[in-house]
């Protein structure tokens, strides 16, 4: 009966959406000459999560005109490959995946692929849909450490709740391992959030993992959206009750595309920002967009240009516009307009996998996350890890600057001391083990708090070639690789310990490739050759004080120019113990208010 009800809901959606989708498709602009030479109040470069959220918010005022320029197209209705979260990964390698390639990495001399959505909705089209929030101390540090007034947990939480249309789990889902604290969630928002449920029975393995953890004093079955993500619990997803993905285009564009003051241009990319340099401070007055060095156009902004192209692309747009480090710009022949550390401070995480075959008694659906503290991750090796934290920060900062991941050792040391405080004094979670029980016990895991820093920089003066170097410098910090190894070792241990032994039917990954009694150092050797990017890169246009290496201020305004902001995932100055969608949505709402405040001050 449960499965039948779910299927009937899916049929309703399948018959209800096509006309709206068709109307939206027909309303989108594909001819660049329709906007070339015209003027809008705001131009948004990128139609992803933050771009569409801010566009929807600004155009609530019918007097504000907005143009969104997106390289991709409307893809929300492409079918299960996007709409069904259980098809996660199937879309990779298609036209909806930007699939950025790193340079050959120093750790193993191979390139890695960084997945990122291309299309209206951005990475909300291709991600796993997980819905958690970071630790309070992490967001608080944006204000207390990095000088961003108004950026703390208490100020950001209302914005994160505002966008939610959250559903509490039902009794069966709670019995399987869900927990929901209504005080931490909003119910009147736009983004649908709730339990993922295929209609199948739930695996007993989640509760067995919880029982083992509880016996060790680790919290279980908690709401991971309340500011202290720690322990094991099933998690919410951005998904409708009928299990359709709640992506940004479906929620922020589909209801609003008919607004006469909102225009969406697809199939085009923003190459650079246009500046009026006749004033004392350069002022953004539009963008150059197109597809080719010989086929590009200008469009003008009456008030502001807003960059929302993501942590890999927004810094490239700035550099092509003359905003960045002189050495980088000189290398490609771009005249420097403003000196800022654009493209530095890149922080992404690394993922490895531990996978076990299971007996039939473990069968069933289920996804959960284990957010493990520093000491839980390292176990009896914690003293070794603490020794690194207590003795190596200055050396690490020097190494990062020498490799081009940051520009100032003293400023980077502030970041490192902040991270040490999180891990030692605040018990901020250091690793996440993501648990999936569908047909197996699959544990994907990552070190949440990397100390390494990388960069993204342009390699050509032509923005439409999109030639750039993306180097996250994975595992060039000894604590990063040790932490990844420790989390992997922990994942293997929890797969076949206590109550979990009854389900265990042999290990598939790493299996025979790594001895079962492998030491932590053996795991270090293993993870160096067996990892991928986690696709959570942040920091390349960091929001922090200029003295600490910031590119934008607390209102997301680019330092040293007027009428230009960066509003996407490149601005968080730190990594977070969370899946990042919730924070990006909250940021978009908060920055929208700053934009509107400046607009109202101008027109009034």
Curated annotation (Swiss-Prot):
GO biological process: secondary metabolite biosynthetic process
A Pfam cross-reference name: GMC_oxred_N
Disulfide cysteine pairs (residue numbers): 184-226
InterPro entries found in the cross-reference section: FAD/NAD-bd_sf (IPR036188), Glucose_Oxidase_domain_2 (IPR027424), GMC_OxRdtase (IPR012132), GMC_OxRdtase_N (IPR000172), GMC_OxRtase_C (IPR007867)
Active site positions, chain numbering: 536
Annotated residues for binding of O2: 557-558
Glycosylation: residue positions: 63, 109, 214, 375, 408, 517, 600
PROSITE patterns in alphabetical order: GMC_OXRED_1 (PS00623), GMC_OXRED_2 (PS00624)
UniProt subcellular location: Secreted; Secreted, Cell wall; Cytoplasm; Secreted, Extracellular space, Extracellular matrix
An example Gene Ontology molecular-function term: oxidoreductase activity, acting on CH-OH group of donors
Keyword field contains Cell membrane: no
Reactions performed catalytically: beta-D-glucose + O2 = D-glucono-1,5-lactone + H2O2
Binding site for FAD: 49-50, 70, 123, 127-128, 130, 270, 569, 581
Factors inducing expression: Expression is negatively controlled by decreasing oxygen levels. Expression is highest at pH 7.0 and decreases by 68, 83, and 89% at pH 9.0, 5.0, and 4.0, respectively.
Keyword line: Cell wall, Cytoplasm, Disulfide bond, Extracellular matrix, FAD, Flavoprotein, Glycoprotein, Oxidoreductase, Secreted, Signal, Virulence
Cofactor(s) listed: FAD
Signal sequence region: 1-16
Subunit structure as annotated in this protein's UniProt entry: Homodimer.
Function: Glucose oxidase catalyzes the oxidation of beta-D-glucose to D-glucono-delta-lactone and hydrogen peroxide in the presence of molecular oxygen. D-glucono-delta-lactone is sequentially hydrolyzed by lactonase to D-gluconic acid, and the resulting hydrogen peroxide is hydrolyzed by catalase to oxygen and water. Acts as a key factor contributing to fungal disease of apple. The production of gluconic acid leads to host tissue acidification that enhances the expression of pectolytic enzymes and the establishment of conditions for necrotrophic development of P.expansum.
Family assignment from sequence similarity: Belongs to the GMC oxidoreductase family.
Protein name stated in the entry: Glucose oxidase 2
Gene: gox1
